[in-house]
């Protein structure tokens, strides 16, 4: 199983609902590296790196998000892995 990198944009009610903190917790549980941040337009951006199956699981989680989120759309772009270490909230 290879290492993959996914670049996500998550839309809907995804700010002010604990999305970043919850994604960080899920990523650490799954052993996925990367980062997550809020964007000025109200969306959330994230980069996920890890084993394909684990990254796919976190993308699946992102379609639902934490309990108070209302995700309307998730865009995924696949990129070359860059060697992310840990999972952090960057903004």
UniProtKB/Swiss-Prot annotation:
UniProt cross-references to InterPro entries, sorted A to Z: Acylphosphatase, Acylphosphatase-like_dom, Acylphosphatase-like_dom_sf, Acylphosphatase_CS
Active site: 20, 38
Domain of life, source organism: Archaea
Enzyme Commission number(s): 3.6.1.7
Alphabetic keyword roster: Hydrolase
Membrane-spanning intervals of the chain: none
Acylphosphatase-like domain: residues covered: 5-91
EC class of the enzyme, as a word: hydrolase
PANTHER family: ACYLPHOSPHATASE (PTHR47268:SF4)
Name of this protein: Acylphosphatase
Protein's organism: Pyrococcus abyssi (strain GE5 / Orsay)
């Amino acid at each position: 199983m290879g290492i993959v990198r996914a670049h996500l944009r998550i839309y809907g009610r995804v700010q002010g609902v604990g999305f970043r903190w919850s994604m960080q917790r899920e990523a650490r549980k799954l052993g996925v590296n990367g980062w997550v941040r809020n964007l000025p337009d109200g969306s959330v951006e994230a980069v996920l790196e890890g084993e394909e199956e684990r990254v796919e699981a976190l993308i699946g989680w992102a379609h639902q998000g934490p309990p108070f989120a209302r995700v309307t759309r998730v865009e995924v772009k696949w990129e070359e892995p860059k060697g992310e270490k840990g999972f952090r909230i960057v903004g």
